[in-house]
Amino acid sequence: MPDLHINGLDHVAIRVKDLERSAQWYQRVLGLKRYQPEAWGPFPIFMLAGRSGIALFPKRPGDPDQLQRSDIDHFAFNVDLETLHQAKERYTKLGLRFDLQDHTYFHSIYTQDPDGHTVELTAIVVAEDDFYKDV
């Protein structure tokens, strides 16, 4: 049976307490573009970088105020090293808490959105052809 041809990750859907607050956060902090066709109604709100991103959905009626994040630990956006450094400066100016990590082949910066979802930006720091040679 042949492998499926996956083009890439399209979106990660998350539940948030306040759709507008979350949409504004993803735009202000990460520079994602809002995409919300009228035909969809009030949600979801897609926050996109190119053709991939986050789909924001409101919390369900009856959900606790502290939303459960299921088994998702975090989600990551791929950036170049210059953008990673720009993110550090931007997060500092915005007063956001963040964590920098060296993953040998990648460097990453982590922060949390208003609902506590961990958002990572990651940049490869070795030759991509070497790292992805067996993929």
Role assignments for model-derived ranges:
Residues 6-8, 68-72, 102-103:
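Short glycine-enriched loop/turn motifs at secondary-structure junctions
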Residues 21-22, 82-87:
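Short, conserved charged micro-motifs
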Residues 43-45, 73, 107-109:
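Short beta-strand micro-motifs in enzyme catalytic cores
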Residues 14-54:
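Core segments of cupin and vicinal oxygen chelate
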Residues 1-20, 74-75, 79, 127-135:
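N-terminal beta-strand motif that seeds the catalytic metal site of vicinal oxygen chelate
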Residues 57, 63-73, 78:
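Helix-adjacent hinge/juxtasegments
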Residues 1-5, 88-89, 93-135:
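Vicinal oxygen chelate
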